[in-house]
Amino acid sequence: MVDIDWLKDHVEVPDGLTCEQLAKDLVRVGLEEEEIHASQVTGPIVVGYVVDATPEPQKNGKTINWCHIDVGDKYNDVDANGKKVPRGIICGAPNMAAGEKVVVTLPGAVLPGDFKIEPRKTYGHISDGMCASERELGLGDSHNGIILLREYGFSKAEYDALKPGDDVMDLLHLNKPILEINITPDRGYAFSYRGVAREYHNSTGAVYKDPVIELNKDIPVLDGLPAGEPTDIDVSIEDNNPIHGVIGCDRYYARAIRNVDANASSPQWMRRRLTRAGMRGISLAVDVTNYVMLDLGQPLHAYDLDKIDGPIVVRRARTGEHLTTLDGKDHELTEEDLVICDSPSGNHGSRVLGLAGVMGGMYGEVTSETKNVLIESAHFDPVSIARTARRHKIPSEASRRFERGVDTELQPAAAQMAVKLLADLGGGNPSKYPNDVNNTQQRSVIVFKADEVKRVAGLDVDLNRISDILTDIGCSVAGGGNGSFSVLPPTWRPDLNEPCDLVEEIARLIGYDEIPVKVPAVPIVGKTGLTAEQSIRRAIAYELAEMGLVESLSYPFVGEEDFKAFRQDVDEVSKVSVRIANPLAENRPWLRRNILTTLAGSVRRNLHRGLSDVSLYELGHVYLADPKAPAIPALPGCVRPTDAELAALDAGLPDQPLHVSALMTGKAEETGWLATHRDVDWSDAVEAVTRLGKRIGVDFEIRQLSANVVPASWHPGRTAKVYVPVDGSDGVEIGIVGELHPQVDENLDLPKHSAAFELDLTALFASMCIKPVQAKPVSTFPPVKQDFAFVAPSSLTARDLEDAIKKASGDLLESIELFDVYEGEQLSDGLRSLAYSVTFRAKDRTLSGEEMESVRESITKSAKELHATLRV
């Protein structure tokens, strides 16, 4: 949240700057606008002077005040004589008194929660308005009494200048919107007003004043302390389990402030700023630490100094340790959690005070009786904090900043700001002997060649401008005479580590819209466009869509219920399935071995929502476990794996072939008075596969399976395997087609005779001869069409008979189509009639009667070899 009034503390902004314009200025340097939150309060809300307040005890024991309040001539009542008189208002606040200046919400005003102010009769009077508290105006949580303007942080001259009827909307900033921006993970420094002000300066050139510069002037100098002079508290950092070799805490700064007034409260201006930032006011010490965090970006934690025993120890948690955090929740800690401990009764680091950088514990917290406060200002490893926050589900404001990276030089300045505010507002005495355990590493110098900007971003930028930009973002820049700079990034920019990072900064601050659009000058070598496999995949999708199927994408996760629904043995299938270590759903821990299993779920959901005739298809990967594959190594986080580790990872991955699957249900045709109302069956799935083959230039072979070898999920008499013909072999199996088993239909609530197919496209690509297809010349000679009807054994497949006709027809065959299948009383048992429509055509001549008679005899002879006779 960005409050323009707060932003003015660090950077000069023009008068009348709106949130809309501020958002545009920040977007220019990469800080994206999320939302502009308009005020929830509308007037009239004015200053009122309490002329009199008459206490009136009530039957319920409560005392209310019947008040007459002067709200200015514009808003005062008018008596019977036309004279302006104060308004009568009921107020139950205990701090109401005559002579006070208060905030009056008049009829027509709207308060947060869409609370409308209207005249109303209460306690025997007409209350013509309301005297408001902080909570009612959305300025804070205080509801113990109404706002008394003399206690609201105004100087005597400012208070005396307040007149009845003055507009409070602007006076208390009630009409000010606030800008919410999105901070990307690499821009953690912008998670503060200090950082946002710097970015506003980078965008507009407005004068920026870093608050840390002034704070550093007042920090106690630790070098040269008198010998034996004790610091506020001893600190020991003992990390015996660093993550990736990086210690969890490389700087811990502790500073005390004593004799703080325990009854002191946060001033109104601070409570208002915290409220507008979305934080709740708690106590002076806690509010100050939150305020400093929002202002500078350094999370702080306040301890009751009298409750903790030194030394403070920063270490990893031990197995079995527990911590009750400030939100009242108990957490079982792990050996990866970084914790802050103290040492009661001399037991070194034995008591856990809090989760470092995430949230403090109940013990040692600041209370209403705390007088001596210890401020913790530390720098923690982002990876360690992020893991702890996620493990314990505590996404605190502190952890959000630490996991994005905090300035390693900011800790003393943040503590100085905190103790100064506590001293000014609570009368405390800041210590001159803080303890600073500093193990931070010096940033590495980046050797940066200026021509990288041109090479990477395409921007022509002169050396002086490059130097100015890098200096302006806080870098120390040296050299440049030969086009090469030595650049030391600032401590608040942990994202700047390589030359490419500096190129990105230069491009960002010049403006991405300034990068010219240029066609690459290097000639394109080799083939462009889609690969052959991509073209085939697209053709398959187009063909299925043209057939009326709708593409679907399903999650690839399956479980026992899916196996059972498809009549599969759970134990056997799970052994050969890839199990996920951290599944999204515990009841689906495996990856699918075929698409049909997950596609069926999509079809079922659509049917349950009242749709009918649902036919879906999906192109996607399946996952086949390899029992001989090596175990996948555990790779470190935030560190690039070695080539050997990547090779081992690749070797352990399961095979992931590309499949296409379809599931068709309901009616085969659109409904209507001309429709046949035929249900989908196996023939529709076979037709779909056949059309796919024709679309991609492959003549698929459909071979019916014997009932005893049909997979359990499929209908034993209406299932076939799909093969790709390959010279010199019996073909390559690439899939299955047919109807689902009736029990599967019932298990999944699918209509009867639901048809499906699944093809292995990876195997198809490997078997195909992918090369340009030579187009056949169009013959100008007339075709000859003849019908053949054969009586054949029922065991003879139509495909086998069709192949015999093709072989006998030779080059004269143009097309063949099965148009009738008959089984009935006119034929003996075990026989059926198969009728084909065949078209013949020669490329170079008109076919003669003699030629056609010869072809017909050849076809008849080939059919007889299969025990099929021509019907006459």
Describe the function of each predicted region.
Residues 21, 471-478, 617, 645-649, ...:
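A carboxyl-terminal module marker
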Residues 4, 10, 22-24, 52, ...:
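Glycine/proline-enriched, intrinsically flexible loops and inter-domain linkers
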Residues 47-89, 271-272, 289-365:
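Conserved mixed alpha/beta core segments that line enzyme active sites in large multi-domain catalysts
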Residues 126-148, 155, 169, 173, ...:
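Mobile "lid/hinge" segments at catalytic clefts and subdomain interfaces of large enzymes
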Residues 120, 313-366, 521-656, 718, ...:
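Class II aminoacyl-tRNA synthetase-like tRNA-binding/catalytic domains
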Residues 41-44, 217-219, 292, 488, ...:
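Beta-rich nucleic-acid/ligand-interaction surfaces
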Residues 195, 446-450, 454-614, 839-841, ...:
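Extended, well-folded interaction surfaces typified by the phenylalanyl-tRNA synthetase beta subunit core
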